[in-house]
Each structure stands twice: as C-alpha cells, then as structure tokens.
Amino acid sequence: MKLIIAEKPSVAKSIASTLGVKSGADGSFQGNGYIVSWCVGHLVSPMDAAGYNENFKKWRYDDLPILPEPFRYVIAPGKEAAFENLRTLMNRPDVDTVVNACDAGREGELIFRLVYEMTGCKKPIERLWISSMEDSAIREGMNDLRPGAEYDALYQSALCRQKADWLVGINATRLFSVLYHRTLNVGRVQTPTLAMLAEREAKTMMFRKEKYHHVRLKVNGAEAVSEKIISPEDAEKVKAACTDRSAVCVSVKREQKKEQPPKLYDLTTLQREANRIFGYTAKQTLDYAQSLYEKKLLTYPRTDSRYLTSDMAETASCVIHLAAKVPPFDKCSSFYPLVELMVSDKDVTDHHAIIPTMETEKADISALPVGERNLFLLVCCRLLCASAEPFHYETVTATFECGGHTFTAKGKHILSEGWREIERIFRSSLKDKPEDEDGGADLPELMEGETYDNVSAEITEHYTQPPKPFTEDTLLSAMENAGKADMPDEAERKGLGTPATRAAIIEKLVSAGFVERKGKNLIPTKAGMNLVTVLPEPLTSPMLTAEWEQRLTSIARGEADPGEFLNGICAMVKDTVSTYSHISEEGQKLFAPDKEVIGNCPRCGKPVYEGKSNFACSDRSCSFVLWKNDRFWTSRKKELTKKMAADLLKKGRTAVKGMWSEKKGDTYDATVVMEDTGGRFINFKLEFPKRKDGANGRK
C-alpha cells in the first residue's frame, strides 16, 4: 500500500478524490490501495539556540557565534498530533512506499523530508511532481512517480537555505540586539532587501528639486516643445523670439514599430502586475493564487518560468479558447492563437508559467471571492495577450525651427492593436482603471519645408523629480534583478530570495517595524534606516546574497557542494561577531528611544529624561537621579509623577496632596522641597502652609 503525504488537507482531499479514495478517517483518507494524509505546513523545524544549551536563553555577546554541529530539529509547537499521526501511518506494516506529494518545489521537499527523517522511516520514497491540481494532472503524475533519490540534491539545497537563514538570523540578531540594547531582527535575505529600500529613501531625502522650463509652440494643431531651459530669463527670450513668428517644419520622421506580446506570468511578474493594477500586496497575490491552484483553476503558482513546455501546446490551445469565452474577453476580436510564442523547453525548470486550467470551462468565475476573481481574470488576460498578434504602431517626430530655436512634436498612430486590444478591454472592465501608459497622440498632417505663420508660444514650469519610493511592484523587480549585472548570463537564479519567499520577506520587514506601507509605497522607518547604517556590508549587500541564492540553485542541480556553502556562511558569521564586539557612543544614540525632556539637571544643566523607575540626567557622568520608589515617597503612599518631577527640577519644590501619615493614620497636604547636596541620593523636606491667626491670638 502507498502512503501519500500532501502539504495540506485541501490538497490531500483533491488527491484522494482523484484516486477514488472515499473513506475518511482521523487525519487521513484510506481505500483503493492508498492512504492519503497531510503535513499542515512545516511540522518539523530547527531547534532554537536554547535547545542546544540552557545558557543560550539569555542573549550574551560571549556566547557568540552559535554554530550547531550537527543541527537538531524539533516538532513545531502545536503540531504534535499531526506529526504522531504521520509517524503511525509510516510505521504501518501494510505501507511499503511513501509518496511525497508536498508542493513540487524546494520548500515542499524540505517539509516532507524533515518529517520522514524525524520519524525514522526507512521505506522507499517516490515523488509526485505536478504543476496543476486538475484530476488529469494528478492521475498523470501518479502514473509517472519518480524515485525520491532524484530529488536528494533539491533537499540538500533546501537544508542549506534553512541552515544559512538560522546561522545568520540567530547570530546577527543576537549580536546587534545585544550591542544596541534593542531587538534588531537581522535576516540573510530581508536585511539586503531593507538596504535597497534605505538606499532609495536616502537618495530621496538628499534630493533637491530644480526648476526648469519648456517653451511650447502651437503649430497647426500640434504642440512642439523646446529643449529643457534652466533660466527663466532665457525661456522668456525664446518665447519672445517665437511669438507671432513663422515656424518651419524642417523634418518629419515616421517609423513603424511593433511591440511583441508579453510573456506569460511567473509568480514575481504576477505579483508585480497585481500590485500595480489592484494594489494587492505580494502576500495577498500569493495567497489568492495558491487558493485558485487548490481549486484547480490555476496551475502551480510558485514558479520562476514564463514559458510552457512543448508537450503542453495542445492543452494551452484549448485553455486559450476557454479563456476567450470568459467575460470581458468575449468582447475581443477573434484571433488565431500563436501558441508557439509561449513554448520554450529550455526556459522551463521545475514548473511552467502560470496559466488557467481546463476547469475554467466548468467554473462559475463570478462566484469567486473578489480578490481571487480579479487574479484569475488577470491570468486569463495574460494568456490571451501572450498568444495574440504583436501591437503595430507608427511614431512620428516632427522638428520645427522658429526664431533661431528648435522644437519637437511627437505623436503615435496605431496601425493594429493586436494583443493590446485584449489588455484594453480588460482594463476598461475594471472599476479602478490604472493610468494609461501609452502616451502620444496622432499628429495632424505635417509636411517638410512647410511654413506656419503666427505661431503662439507659452512657457511651462517643471521641476526635477526625486527617485520614486518603492512599491511592491518595483521592489519585487529590484529583488529579482539584484546582482544580475555581476552574474554570468547562463545563471539560472538571480536576485534576492525566490518567487516563493519574496512575499514573506516583505511582510517580515513590515511586522518587525523596519518598513511601513504608505498607500502603495514601501517606506523604511527610522529604525530600518538606522539598522542598515550599523550593519556590516556582508549582511546588507544584495549582490552577495544574490550570489548565495545562485549557489543554492547550483546545489539543487548537483553542481555545488553543500558543505562548502555552509562553511562560507559560518566563516562570514564568525568574522562578523569578531569584528563587531563593541560600538561607539554615536552608534548607541541611533537606537536610543525617543524620550520626553522632563526638565534640566540642577547639577549640570543637561536634559533629564523619564525612565522606568526614575527621572535621570542624560549625561552618564552626572549622577543626578530622582527615584520613583524612593522611600520618601513609598512611606507616604505616593509615587513621584512626571509633573511632580518637572516642578522639582524647575522650582525645587512641588505641592502634593493626600500624603499618608503612619503616625496619625491619616492623610495630609504639604509642599515637598528638594535638597540636593550633590550625593548619590536626593533629600527632601516638607513645608506646611502657615495657619491664619485665630480669635484668641493663637495661630
């Protein structure tokens, strides 16, 4: 009997249904020669540092670096029952083979293998590797199960990725948190990503806008524009030289161009487009795509390929015709799909591009949740566009001379919309339409050598623009292309992270307080900027991290040694710990909490801040401090408040009501006067208001 282990219950249910396994028991489906169960994500995770040594519970510099050998693993908290269920099923005597049906990728391989290793199972492994949850794909995959050993290198790559993240994360986070007395989460991939955001923000902050001008002529219904003019006086001179004068068209250049159809989506380009059009975060897009995959409507989403394999051509043609019937695409002109444009076997590694499935024919798309529906239609749109004719257009550039100056008018004339018609119809169906990026309009008929009299001229003011903040669209692009210029063209993987992990990296930066969302923009916080400032270059370098990602890909292909990779990570960690044993006073100030000034120190004049238990001088060499739990206050059942401390610092006294007298068993009001003798502790004395004279002359 085969035991099939999926990554989550919904996938297990689909596999069981396809294989005719009807009977459901606790934690599995059984029947027809199969047991189908699931992992519920990561059931096994690396042990925390404290698991290796009780002393590691406290974060101390002297314990670093922490380099486990060997790495040990534990069952993820709260998932003990799920793990025990799989252990029991693996140990059943009637189970002779275990099928890994977790997601067909690096992380899915890791999820299964760690469970398999921890249970101590020695039974043969087979691999179900599919790119769609359609019944036909599952049946085909089950008929072509691969030996588990074929994916050993992929597992080693996944282990190296996990260990590298642990080594860098645990050591660098502890190191810089101890040095700066604040939890500073440092990650192998998230920190270089933060560095890119910080660099962009720094350029924006340093930017100083500059004014410039254009002179614009109205010529026979066309607008011709001068070159950039810095000086307003010069712009006025150009305007004066042209107003009511004649302009001569000295050249008209026409050029026919074509824009090829866009490629199909991989996960990163899908996330970018969904962010640009719908404002979805990378995580939202991945979640929607994963749900559509599990509903059998989209193919496997965590792919980095934008092509299909040649054996998919017939299926793709069928899916294209189905997608063309889905509103609003049913309004598009009919066309003969060019499937060959989307096929390239050499450009497909683990999984092909994301496309709809044959289930499109039976599905009620209108019943999908709005986020999933939008994403599904976006993928349909891209499939249709990718198989359509090119977009043909003509550009026109007309050059004029007037008053001794040159002006240019540009226009565009559409010859054949091709794939752009499909995109236009889809965009027009959206309630929130994105900005039109085409630019350029038809120019009136213009002839070289023709003179146009009495032209009008006007000056327009413009300002240079700062670098635009990153959006998830542009950040995903930057992550994907990090280090690209420094890697050989044949390198299969470039960039920070993988399509499957980039969304989580962005979310970690936001949840850690290093990045915040402002509309569509991602802006580093003050803490994020400061963190990048204090970290060493190996931890913030996008290029170095991209090289590591390339090494991991080489390990997955059996072309690099896992041990060498981890030795390099360990060496970098050791070097970082030894180099950063202390920090400057200026560095300490970067992460000092924002404090309110209560007053000025009576001894040295420096600001006094409120702490958890006191009000202390900001100058460490000055010993002035007012303790909130001073016995003077606690014996009178009062606490030194911020207002009272401010009065003492400003006036040397504060009025206090309701102080307790142990002797009389009652409360009283008095003025507390501060007597600072310059010692370690501050003394106080009480002053009582004088009573008015009574009738008998006594006070």
Can you say where each PLM-predicted feature lies in the sequence?
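Conserved short loop/turn motifs at secondary-structure junctions
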Residues: M1, V99-A104, H181-T183, R254-K263, ...
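Intrinsically disordered, low-complexity regulatory segments
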Residues: M1-Q162, W166, P337, P466
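Basic, low-complexity terminal or inter-domain segments flanking catalytic cores
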Residues: K2-L3, K79, M90, T173, ...
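Amphipathic alpha-helical transducer elements in NTP-driven molecular machines
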Residues: P9-A16, G33-V36, V40, A76-R87, ...
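C-terminal or mid-to-C-terminal helical accessory/interaction module adjacent to the motor/catalytic core
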Residues: F71, P93, D135-L217, R254-K258
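Metal- or metallocofactor-binding catalytic centers and their adjacent structured scaffolds
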Residues: A149, P232-Y265, Q271
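Short polybasic amphipathic segments
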Residues: H213-K218, V396-F400
